[in-house]
């Protein structure tokens, strides 16, 4: 069963994918997708906020991908994998109300639904590295 937030993330991913692949304006894509897939007011706010934040911070998110998936140039990742990572890394770093494990699980589920055969495993590995690095940084600050 698809949760309400999972469906919202699917819509965010679709908008990011279409913007990345075809250069369409993400907000215009969202408006079309939300006409086709009506959401609660709360989800609409979540969808626009998350999409706009990922678009705004794309370069920084890509730097994180380069750091934690150094064997894979960002430009060579599939459009789906690249945007699942952008979305999840943003949530892990900036969305304090979303537990890290939930953000990783949601990203893996998106990868299973929309990505290639090895996407879920790849996404899980990269995001686990991001999570570990953040935990290590937090532990260093506490010491």
Swiss-Prot record:
GO terms for cellular component: cytosol. Transmembrane segments: none annotated. GO terms for biological process: DNA-templated transcription termination; transcription antitermination. InterPro entries: NusB-like_sf, NusB_fam, NusB_RsmB_TIM44. Signal peptide: none annotated. Pfam families: NusB (PF01029). The keyword Translocase does not apply. SUPFAM superfamilies: NusB-like (SSF48013). GO terms for molecular function: RNA binding. Keywords: RNA-binding, Transcription, Transcription antitermination, Transcription regulation. Involved in transcription antitermination. Required for transcription of ribosomal RNA (rRNA) genes. Binds specifically to the boxA antiterminator sequence of the ribosomal RNA (rrn) operons. Belongs to the NusB family. PANTHER family: ANTITERMINATION NUSB DOMAIN-CONTAINING PROTEIN, N UTILIZATION SUBSTANCE PROTEIN B-RELATED. HAMAP family: NusB. This is Transcription antitermination protein NusB.
């Amino acid at each position: 069963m698809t949760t309400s937030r999972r469906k919202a993330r699917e819509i965010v991913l679709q908008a990011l994918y279409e913007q990345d692949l075809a250069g369409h304006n993400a907000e215009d894509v969202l408006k079309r997708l939300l006409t086709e897939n009506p959401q609660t007011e709360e989800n609409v706010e979540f969808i626009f906020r998350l999409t706009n934040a990922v678009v705004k911070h794309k370069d920084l998110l890509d730097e994180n991908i380069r750091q934690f998936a150094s064997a894979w140039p960002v430009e060579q990742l599939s459009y789906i994998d690249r945007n699942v990572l952008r979305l999840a890394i943003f949530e892990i770093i900036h969305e304090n109300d979303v537990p890290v494990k939930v953000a990783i699980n949601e990203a893996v589920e998106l990868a299973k639904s929309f990505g290639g055969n090895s996407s879920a495993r790849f996404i899980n590995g990269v995001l686990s590295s991001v999570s570990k690095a953040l935990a290590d940084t937090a532990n260093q600050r506490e010491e």
